[in-house]
UniProtKB/Swiss-Prot annotation:
InterPro entries named in the record: MFS_dom (IPR020846), MFS_sugar_transport-like (IPR005828), MFS_Sugar_Transporters (IPR050360), MFS_trans_sf (IPR036259), Sugar/inositol_transpt (IPR003663), Sugar_transporter_CS (IPR005829)
Residues in the Cytoplasmic compartment per record: 1-106, 164-178, 222-234, 292-363, 419-426, 481-492, 547-609
Residue ranges that the UniProt entry lists as topological domain Extracellular: 128-142, 200, 256-270, 385-397, 448-459, 514-525
Entry function: High-affinity uptake of maltose and maltotriose. Also transports alpha-methylglucoside, glucose and turanose but not melezitose or trehalose.
Signal peptide location: none
Full protein name: Alpha-glucosides permease MPH2
Gene3D superfamilies, per the entry: MFS general substrate transporter like domains (1.20.1250.20)
Matching Pfam families: Sugar_tr
GO MF annotation list: alpha-glucoside transmembrane transporter activity; carbohydrate:proton symporter activity; maltose transmembrane transporter activity
A GO cellular component entry from the record: membrane
Subcellular location field: Cell membrane
Length: 609
């Protein structure tokens, strides 16, 4: 935090100033602060300060005004400091916050793992013979398209239910305990998958496991965005994508081993299910000791607990650390208080659509996450099955999948470097543009039946995975945490993720019909379809997706309130803490300047929080 010594001195000055009037009466001290009814109705951020003869003790009146103005000034200082904080300083100041965020996000490894093994099972010989049927034309064993669709629908339906349960659970017990409960249920539901003897049991197990996965999808992103400063926000929210990839890579390695050693044994599919018991217990213990989100605590009015939570995320000791805590709590208070004027007291799902501002924020968040499905990423999840249907051998299909996930991990790390030079929108849009081109090439190669074209289409799907994990895949986790207001963040993310799940269900059904030999049997020619859909997603991003890189939450709030267009978000500068007065035409940016005004009896000062 910059200028800590200055802030310490200012605090001391404020303390001494409060004792200037030990017993003397001031005739024109501010006696109350009010917001008129029309201002409240219009949702304007204007606080009306009336100056009139004070009937209360002068020192009490002065203290009230000083506290209100100091809170706003503290919020401004915290916001400016966060915006200008270098990455190295952020890591040095918030190392514990980064560590706690990484721990919570690790829960997504399990979702990435299980969803990947489900798609890989369709290419596993023992699974095909145990639960599938033989194709009369080709003689091959495979899981019917209807069952593939059913299993996919089950876990996605479970995720939708889990996401909806997450909202009230977080409101009731907070982020930490909600995650711990979800981990407990995941460990319990895994028994159903391990002891499965029919596709029906797998369907039930997938549906039940989907509920805790839905919880992980929402809370990992919101927790990372709320516990860390702006300089770390991109890295720690996009780490969620890395966790997905780690889980998928782990699954690909396990499935390749199963294909080699347990191709004719039930351990080929039981062992991958059993490995899901590794993480829940250690993760639950770690999350139990993690600090709660200070934003959630402030929303609940638990300010002392919010301060304790912030102390646990900061390094160092002494007055500097306490000032950091005070400034951050004041900033959170001011941000939430501003949002309360536009929404209901508690914040409900209906608030996400109540007014034009929140409707826009909700729409962008939902479509942004849905873009992860419409860009063709679901095809990457069925990569092993795709490679096999494109004519690649089963063993080579599993090898391609491992290479694909390794490329995805490298691409996500590369996106961290690229984020220093390009914005969120840039990475999102450029990634879609490259994916569109590659998908059309894959479709063209699918029109040929030569061995070279089959290997080429498989190789290019790895290129799609690379560009996807360089652009849209990681940046979405950051964008969906920045677009909603702080009071509605969890609920908006839940709506957005459920939008993604619904769109993913549709895309998964289409993919399974496109690849299954008993249905459309498109094979690599399906690249044409996903190229067109990816291009449509790109057009939406150009028109509607704002650039939020380098913007703090309070700045983003102000830009949305002003109705700034998507392409002007980056260049528009706002000061959410500016103070205006009708006595002067200039803008007053600190409460300290208010004391210098030649205030007269019954004069007004409008303070723009």
């Amino acid at each position: 935090m910059k200028n800590l010594s200055f802030l310490i001195n200012r605090r001391k000055e404020n303390t001494s100033d409060s004792n200037v009037y030990p017993g003397k009466a001031k005739s024109h001290e501010p006696s109350w602060i009010e917001m008129d009814d029309q201002t409240k109705k219009d949702g304007l951020d204007i606080v009306h300060v009336e100056f009139s003869p004070d009937t209360r003790a002068p020192s009490d009146s002065n203290k009230v005004i000083t506290e209100i103005f100091d809170a706003t000034e503290d919020a401004k200082e915290a916001d400016e400091s966060e915006r200008g904080m270098p990455l190295a300083t952020a890591l040095n100041t918030y190392p514990k916050a980064a560590a706690w965020s990484l721990l919570v996000s690790t829960t997504l490894i399990m979702e990435g793992y299980d969803t990947a093994i489900l798609g890989a099972f369709y290419a596993l010989p023992i699974f095909q013979r145990k639960f599938g049927s033989q194709n009369d034309k080709t003689g091959e064993w495979e899981i019917s398209a209807s069952w593939q669709i059913g299993l996919t629908l089950c876990y996605m339906a479970g995720e939708i239910v889990g996401l909806q349960l997450t909202g009230p659970s977080v409101d009731l017990v907070g982020n930490r305990y909600t995650l711990i409960i979800a981990l407990f249920f995941l460990a319990a539901f895994t028994f159903i998958l391990y002891f499965c003897n029919s596709l029906g049991m797998i369907a039930v197990g997938q549906a039940l496991c989907g509920m805790p996965w839905g919880c992980f999808q929402c809370l990992t992103v919101s927790y990372a965005s709320e516990i860390c400063p702006l300089a770390l926000r991109y890295y720690l929210t996009t780490y969620s994508n890395l966790c997905w990839l780690f889980g998928q890579l782990f699954a690909a390695g396990i499935m390749k081993n199963s294909q080699k050693k347990y191709a004719d044994s039930e351990l080929g599919y039981k062992l991958p299910f059993a490995l899901q018991w590794i993480l829940p217990v250690p993760l639950a213990l770690g999350i139990f000791f993690a600090p709660e989100s200070p934003w959630w605590l402030v929303k609940k009015g638990r300010f002392d607990e919010a301060r304790r939570s912030l102390r646990r995320t900061l390094s160092g000791k002494g007055p500097e650390k306490e000032i950091l805590v005070t400034l951050e709590v004041d900033k959170i208070k001011v941000t939430i208080d501003k949002e309360k004027r536009l929404t209901s007291k508690e914040g409900s799902y209906s608030d996400c659509f109540e007014d034009k501002i929140n409707r826009r924020r909700t729409r962008i968040t939902c479509l942004c996450w849905a873009g992860q499905a419409t860009c063709g990423s679901i095809l990457i999840g069925y990569s092993t099955y795709f490679y096999e249907k494109a004519g690649v051998s089963t063993e080579m299909s599993f090898t391609f999948s491992i290479i694909q996930y390794c490329l995805g991990i490298c691409a996500t790390f590369l996106s961290w470097w690229a984020s220093k030079y390009f914005g969120r929108y840039d990475l999102y849009a450029f990634g879609l543009a490259f994916q569109t081109i590659v998908f059309f090439i894959i479709g063209g190669l699918g029109c040929s039946s030569t061995h070279g074209s089959k290997m080429g289409s498989g190789s290019l799907l790895m290129a799609v995975a690379f560009f996807y994990n360089l652009g849209i895949a990681p940046v979405v986790f950051c964008l969906v945490s920045e677009m909603p207001s702080s009071r509605l963040r969890t609920k908006t993310i839940i709506l957005a993720r459920n939008t993604y799940n619904v769109v993913s269900i549709i895309c998964s059904v289409l993919i399974l019909y496109q690849l299954n030999s008993k249905k459309w049997n498109w094979g690599a020619k399906s690249g044409f379809f996903w190229g067109v859909l990816c291009f449509c997603t790109l057009i939406w991003a150009v028109v509607d997706l704002p650039e939020t890189a380098g913007k703090t939450f309070v700045e983003i709030n102000e830009l949305f309130k002003l109705g700034v267009s998507a392409r002007k978000f980056k260049s528009t500068k706002v000061d959410p803490f500016v103070v205006k007065t009708p006595l002067k035409t200039s803008l007053i940016t600190t409460p300290r300047e208010i004391s210098k005004l030649p205030l007269q009896r019954n004069s007004n000062v409008s303070h723009h929080l």
